């Protein structure tokens, strides 16, 4: 099969396009397909905080595949074995959480690339990603089309940000606001002025290094701020949060109850 692998999400990052995404935490292919029909540029399938198995991730990739929205998978960690599984089921873009050092970033790069560029295990003949061995020159194409994003979400990671940005093979850096604010001493308060100052500075440093900058903002005003600061792949909501807010708001229209969604909410 003379198919050529492409990764529109990665191509958009290279061009500097602004790409708007949505976080998927519901773990179901049904919800993933509903989100894919909405027209978001990218959909983050969360395997870190949502109870997704590898098979769950697989089914959601299948559900999204017919649509223009591009899937991004966040595994629970950046282990070589887990990365191998997730890539084999067809993920082309990964977001790796809790990357604190340049050495960690290099290890992740190696885990996502086939030899001689890395240490990804070879098994294309049994992998959905290679159409079960039917894509010619798959290993070279996979190395080229892979998009790797890492999360900076701790005080240690901030101290090592410049070194992380120098690692070849990293396409973008995603700022994790919840963990970052907690690490800085402001738990559940990503809106604190000091945290905001640091986020803005990080986005500037990431873009200045020629990398894409990403963020998750469930508050529309914060999302607009990040876009204005230069972030070019921004998730503007979480499916489970949007669902609970809609349910609560609909209920309060008909019953004298306090809507949960009126309380301050953060990811």
UniProtKB/Swiss-Prot annotation:
Keywords: Lyase, Magnesium, Metal-binding. The keyword Metal-binding applies. Binds 1 Mg(2+) ion per subunit. Substrate binds at residues 151, 178-179. Coiled coil: none annotated. The record marks 74 as: Transition state stabilizer. GO terms for cellular component: cytoplasm. Its EC number is 4.1.2.53. One of its GO terms (molecular function) is 2-keto-3-deoxy-L-rhamnonate aldolase activity. Pfam families: HpcH_HpaI. SUPFAM superfamilies: Phosphoenolpyruvate/pyruvate domain. Catalyzes the reversible retro-aldol cleavage of 2-keto-3-deoxy-L-rhamnonate (KDR) to pyruvate and lactaldehyde. Belongs to the HpcH/HpaI aldolase family. KDR aldolase subfamily. NCBIfam families: PRK10128.1. Homohexamer. This is 2-keto-3-deoxy-L-rhamnonate aldolase. It comes from Salmonella paratyphi A (strain AKU_12601).
């Amino acid at each position: 099969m003379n198919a050529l692998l492409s990764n529109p999400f990665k191509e958009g990052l290279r061009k500097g396009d602004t790409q708007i995404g949505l976080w998927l935490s519901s773990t179901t292919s049904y919800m993933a397909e509903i989100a894919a029909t909405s027209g978001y540029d990218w959909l983050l399938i969360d395997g870190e905080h949502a109870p997704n198995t590898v098979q769950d991730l697989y089914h959601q990739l299948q559900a999204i595949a017919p649509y223009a929205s591009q899937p991004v998978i966040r595994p629970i960690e950046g282990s070589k074995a887990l990365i191998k599984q997730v890539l084999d089921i067809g993920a082309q873009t990964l977001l790796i959480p809790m990357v604190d050092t340049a050495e960690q970033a290099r290890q992740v790069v190696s885990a996502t690339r086939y030899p001689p560029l890395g240490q990804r295990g070879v098994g294309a003949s049994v992998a959905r990603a290679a159409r079960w061995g039917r894509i010619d020159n798959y290993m070279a194409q996979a190395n080229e089309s892979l998009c790797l994003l890492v999360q900076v979400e701790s005080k240690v990671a901030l101290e090592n940000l410049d070194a992380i940005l120098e690692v070849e093979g990293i396409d973008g850096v995603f700022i994790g606001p919840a963990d970052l604010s907690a690490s800085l001493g402001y738990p559940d308060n990503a809106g604190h002025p000091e945290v905001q100052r640091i986020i803005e500075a990080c986005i500037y440093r990431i873009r200045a290094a020629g990398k894409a900058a990403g963020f998750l903002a469930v508050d529309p005003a914060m999302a607009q701020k990040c876009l204005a600061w230069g972030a070019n792949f921004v998730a503007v909501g979480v499916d489970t949060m949007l669902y609970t807010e809609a349910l609560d708001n609909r209920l309060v229209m008909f019953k004298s109850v306090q809507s949960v969604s009126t309380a301050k909410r953060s990811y």
